[in-house]
Amino acid sequence: MASAADWGKPLGANHDGPEGRPRSVTPASPELGADERTTITVFERATKSVVFIANTAIQQDIWSLNVMEVPQGSGSGFIWSKQGHIVTNFHVIYGADAIKVTLADRSEHQAKLVGADPDHDLAVLQIQVSDGQLDPMAIGSSHDLRVGQKVLAIGNPFGLDHTLTTGVVSALGRTIKSMSNRTIEGVVQTDAAINPGNSGGPLLDSAGRLIGVNTQIVSPSGAYAGIGFAVPVDTVNRIVPELIKHGKLIRPGLGVSLVPDAMAKRWGIKGVIIGKVTRGGPADRAGLKGARETMLGQIQLGDVLVSVAGKAVTTIDDLMDAMEEHKIGDHVTVEILRGNRREKVPVTLQAVN
């Protein structure tokens, strides 16, 4: 017969036997594997440079007229400089009236927008902190990446701060569309898990150096599906100093306005049609012509750009990509189609908005 002390025990339970005690821990190997140690070291060093970004919009209640802060979204970023510059995606802070940055030590700081480049989905913020509080992210390169290299992503997916995922470089030289519908070239594809909230965070190589800014995913559900994209660090390292200095990307250009690609396609023209030439600009000084009205009241098309420095251009995106390969003050040869005649014209590039 069961005693009162046994009342309530599951049938057959024996709390005094070995089965009723915590199991002993199986001894581990003396050391972690080399790959594990490397991953841990990289994470512990790099995570200090990763930040959480939350933005809000200011709205006024139509009935009470009270002003409210409404959460807009969140994402990731990383410390660029000891002066408090933070790099993230433009789409992370788009439409924000107020931006808050949380550092790895949990301290919160209001941030101001220093500069943005929607065409490359990049933005630079700045926070005010005391000296020695910030650890800038180590910078690597993307031109020498190889498919199969190990990569690490650190960010705040779904608000879960300082989450680490790992994978490999799945492909190189991809193209994606930015918010402004411009094509971003040379994008790094990875299978490291990228989820909502990872945007703006760093993609690192096995040495813990920045090789890209996590930006987009391809997924039917909107969550991780094994295909993520990062803006290459070589692009980031070229653009961010411009954003810090000028607040925007200062591009070399021809000083022209262009006819939309759709119209050129409709007219069966392969190239970029000049709509208007800025007076005194590079194209004007080189003798390029925009669309103009004839004495009979008819519209005569402007010159058609077909190549820049030997690189063929068939769309406005092509032209802008060709411009990005040059600097302000460069001398380039532009090939145009004027009527039925092809001409090569030397042009000196100048800064344009």
Please state what every model-predicted region is.
Residues 65-67, 273, 286-292:
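Short, solvent-exposed beta-edge and connector elements
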Residues 86-87, 285-316:
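Conserved PDZ fold ligand-binding element
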Residues 2-270, 276-279, 297, 316-320, ...:
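Serine-dependent protease modules
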